[in-house]
Amino acid sequence: MVSLSHYLVLGAVLFAIGVVGIFLNRKNVIILLMSIELMLLAVNINFVAFSYYLQDIAGQIFVFFILTVAAAEAAIGLAILVALFRNIRTINVDDLDRLKG
């Protein structure tokens, strides 16, 4: 039987992979977005695990809202990335300094 601690360890590992992805790849915008989405997924796993453990459906409902916001965030982030790539021809974070005064 899979216990609560298994889900919490899985969530912690996924969150740690996301944090490591952010710290190791600060130059590529796509990897930054993927790492943030992985961290959100880890939080969602913890919400569902605690919701199941406490026999409360509110955590699972909250996960649907988080997934909706995460999908919208990913779509907007990728749209901005495509627009920047068309203008600047790069996705390197260091080259995205046009708004600096």
From Swiss-Prot:
NDH-1 is composed of 14 different subunits. Subunits NuoA, H, J, K, L, M, N constitute the membrane sector of the complex. Its EC number is 7.1.1.-. This is NADH-quinone oxidoreductase subunit K. It is found in: Cell inner membrane. The chain crosses the membrane at residues 4-24, 30-50, 61-81. GO terms for molecular function: NADH:ubiquinone reductase (non-electrogenic) activity; quinone binding. It is a multi-pass membrane protein. GO terms for biological process: ATP synthesis coupled electron transport. GO terms for cellular component: NADH dehydrogenase complex; plasma membrane.
